[in-house]
Amino acid sequence: MHEMSLMGGVFEAIEATLAHHHVKKVLLVKLKIGQLTNAEPDALQMAFAAFAQGTVCEGAELQIEMLPVKGRCRSCSEEFMVPGLIFACPVCQHLGIDITQGEELLLESLEVEE
């Protein structure tokens, strides 16, 4: 369950963000997570609850937005959604693509009570 290690990184980012603020409680944590991380939202929710115990995040809501995989063709520069993880350009069928979305793990925002 790699979601625990992913959530460990999220909590490091939360701690760094809150380090210079006087926050009583975190009310909401919003994450954006790419499909290629293979993170399961339910497992992330459980990991969040475990990490939040005894912290200002205890009782906070976790909202997760899963981001689909997008790519850009290195040959014709077409930008496209990557359906079913088929990494080929739908226009020219070139196999060389750059992933432009889908690998992220982003702390989008925090809603806090000061």
From Swiss-Prot:
Residues bound to Ni(2+): 2
Biological processes annotated in GO: protein maturation; protein modification process
A Pfam match: HypA
Record keyword Transcription present: no
An annotated Gene Ontology molecular function: zinc ion binding
UniProt-annotated binding residues for Zn(2+): 73, 76, 89, 92
Keywords carried by this UniProt record: Metal-binding, Nickel, Zinc
InterPro entries for this protein: HypA/HybF (IPR000688)
Family the entry assigns: Belongs to the HypA/HybF family.
Function: Involved in the maturation of [NiFe] hydrogenases. Required for nickel insertion into the metal center of the hydrogenase.
NCBIfam families on file: hypA (TIGR00100)
PANTHER family documented for this protein: HYDROGENASE MATURATION FACTOR HYPA
Protein name in UniProt: Hydrogenase maturation factor HypA
Gene that produces this protein: hypA
